[in-house]
Amino acid sequence: MTDTEKFPPEKNLPAGYVPPKVWTWEPGNGGAFASINRPVAGATHVKDLPVGKHPLQLYSQGTPNGVKVTIMLEELLAAGHSDAEYDAWLIRIGDGNQFGSGFVEVNPNSKIPALMDHRPKDGGKPLRVFESGSILVYLAEKFGAFLPTEARARTEALNWLFWQMGSAPFLGGGFGHFYAYAPIKIEYAINRYAMEVKRQMDVLNRHLAENEYMAGSTYTIADMAIWPWYGRLALKDAYGDAGDFLSVDEYEHVQRWTKQVGERTGVKRGFMVNRTSGDPSSQLLERHDASDFETKTQDKFGGDPAAKA
């Protein structure tokens, strides 16, 4: 049976669509994200990155992956690690800032978050760190915090960190895209990814029924990685009405953990940094000093998303 017989073109979306022998890129590919997706890597324009006064320079936006790192940095500061002071520069991914030459030098994959450590432990030249999971591990090891040193506990924390790294694309790029962002609603795609996300939520719920935090009784980078993705979903603060669609209230242990983690000062502050949507009082477009949380949130500038960025 040929593919045409197996998958009649008239039943495809759009009707009559048949994949070509060789795919070619068109600028409109990607729907709502067409302006930030392309099939090649590298810089599109020359632009240096700003550098502030602190050794740690973060270039990011308040997406779930970006929030992981700002939560970690704020948790380190709350725990007394004063050397974790940082500058957080806003990279507007919708405007293509991540394709500037300076950003590509820090992360050749052109994705946020990206970190430059101008005071690495080896005393050498500034060190780039990219991929959110890598940044979390790097900071945990640099400051000796939020990642257990005992082998079994460390392994469990890393198990769940990498669970998040592997699972979240199904939540965001899969379910979130087809449920909230795709130009048309495709029943097959939504059903496929809704099933997977509910399975993931059940994995978390069963685990958290027996554990206070992801790695047991201790709060770690695993919690920081998972909360911005699955905690926000549990709070019905992701992908429109997806929380109701997925019946997230039924995951009682995820709900308990979500609220417990969300009450932490480091989480509250980290959630605000580089945030460009939501209540203006929760948006701190850039963070260069601890006092910025009191003086530079967007409500202080009339809620203008372009102000002070």
Residue spans for each PLM region:
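GST-like domain detector, emphasizing the conserved glutathione-binding G-site
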Residues: 1-191, 195-198, 296-309
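Alpha-helical packing segments of well-folded alpha/beta enzyme cores
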Residues: 65, 69, 193-207, 229, ...
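Short, mixed-charge aromatic SLiMs
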Residues: 97, 160-164, 250-266
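Residue-level signal for nonpolar/aromatic packing positions in well-ordered secondary structure
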Residues: 115, 135, 204, 223, ...
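GST superfamily/GST-like fold recognition
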Residues: 171-176, 214-243, 247-256, 260-261, ...
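Cytochrome P450 catalytic-domain "roof"
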Residues: 206-214
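Acidic/histidine-enriched, glycine/proline-rich intrinsically disordered or flexible terminal extensions
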Residues: 275-309
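Active-site rim elements
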Residues: 124, 187-194, 212-213, 241-248
